[in-house]
A protein has these predicted regions:
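Catalytic-core signature of thiol
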Residues: 1-183
Length: 183
């Protein structure tokens, strides 16, 4: 792309992905797996819909005084919270529940991952996460997800049937030798 090198925050994508996954889990009354893990498409979706921030704005492990994130305690708090919301009787009349659970979920995410900035200054210029992503020239739509599975036709798109592909994104299926060649 020729626009320089960047160090973007993985945790910005993680924060937004966890919130989306929690909402999908609540909406489906727990029929989507809410757990650690994700897919390639989560990153592309996150960039397209939420943007990018420099790593310095939301570094990994910052809430623990570490250089890497540790999700074990986070999961022991977050997973039962989301499960409890999915079992709430309010959801029988409203697929998204009340707005209050989202505030509580954001509080958990902020406590364990950090708060996502709405604006930030990078090299003297103010950005939003969306304007930051746009300034890089990176277009998530220019990328495809590749896979190699024998139970689907080759050279066609299909949905990878794994619990971490909760967004039901598609992958282009290649024979294994061609898949390895393009890797």
């Amino acid at each position: 792309m020729g626009k320089g090198e960047y160090d973007f925050s993985e945790m910005f994508i993680v924060w937004n992905t966890y919130m989306d996954r929690a909402q999908a889990t609540v909406r489906t009354h727990g029929d989507i797996s809410f757990s650690q893990g994700g897919s390639f498409y989560d990153v592309l979706y996150g960039i397209k819909h939420y943007g990018l921030v420099p790593d310095a704005e939301l570094p990994a492990g910052v809430m623990h005084g570490e250089t890497l994130s540790n999700f074990s305690e986070f999961s022991s708090v977050c997973d039962p919270f989301v499960e409890g919301i999915t079992k709430n009787k309010t959801l029988q009349t409203s697929p998204d529940g009340t707005p209050l659970w989202r505030n509580a979920m954001a509080g958990i995410l902020n406590a364990y991952i950090g708060e996502c900035p709405e604006t930030f200054v990078y090299e003297g210029k103010e950005y939003t996460p969306k304007s930051s992503a746009e300034s890089t020239g990176f277009n998530p739509d220019d990328y495809v997800n590749l896979a190699s599975f024998s139970h689907h036709p080759f050279y066609e798109k299909f949905i990878i049937e794994v619990q971490d592909n909760w967004r039901w994104s598609t992958a282009y299926n290649l024979p294994i030798d061609e898949f390895m060649e393009v890797m």
